Amino acid sequence: MREQFHRVIAIDGPAASGKSSVARGLARQLGFVYVNSGAIYRAITWHILQKKIHPEERERIADALQAADITCCLQDNESRILIDDVDPGEHLRDDCVNESVAGVSQFPVVRQIVAKKLHEHAQGHDLIVEGRDIGSVVFPDTPYKFYLNASPQVRLQRRAAQGGRDEIAIRDRVDSSRPVSPLVIAKDAHVIDTSHLTIQEVIEEIVGVLEKTGLRA
């Protein structure tokens, strides 16, 4: 039987393209639940590292996740991830997580778990989900797909302003070349270059597209 989902707005794009700020602001404006799929991958990566498992040990990662209790809850209309009742939120941008998340997230078992959690969320709530494969893989049937991008220079500046140390070029290469759920533009996605737009300008463009499709808060 086909899963029945509430309304899902997919916002995909590479690192530092503005996904998080736009998705969070749009969710607040529309009254949808905001979900950062990348935070789920980062939480899983943090959990794996806490278990002293190397990011390339696929079988041990699979076993650890099979034994883990991974749940999503809501806080201020935003999704939070708990693993074995622990909220790793403050550790999601730790250097060790930054260095390992791309490797951990490429494994099919990890992506399947994240997709399952997102599907469970969508069975009970209207969602705005940001990620890299939301419109292309996780929710391919949603009519509300957006892909945000920006120039490499702008993205580097944004990441530096956030105090991050992610290697943008390396992450792009890994995201785009992985065999499972690579970063691609869904064929029916609305593409927005955010390089010279404010967050609110991007939100307004998305709202305009949504209104043309008949979606209202």
Tell me the role of every PLM-derived stretch:
Residues A39-D126, V138, Q153, R165-I170, ...:
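ATP-dependent small-molecule kinase phosphotransfer cores
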Residues K19:
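Conserved lysine of the Walker
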Residues C73, L118-H125, R132-D141, A161-E205:
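Small-molecule kinase domains that catalyze NTP-dependent phosphoryl transfer to phosphate-bearing small molecules
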Residues M1-V8:
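Extreme N-terminal, non-catalytic leader segments
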Residues I11:
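Hydrophobic anchor at the beta1->P-loop junction of P-loop NTPases
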Residues V22:
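Hydrophobic positions on the alpha1 helix immediately C-terminal to the Walker A/P-loop
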Residues I40, I134-G135, N149-Q157, H196-T198:
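Conserved nucleotide-binding/hydrolysis micro-motifs of P-loop NTPases
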Residues A16:
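Walker A (P-loop) phosphate-binding loop of P-loop NTPases
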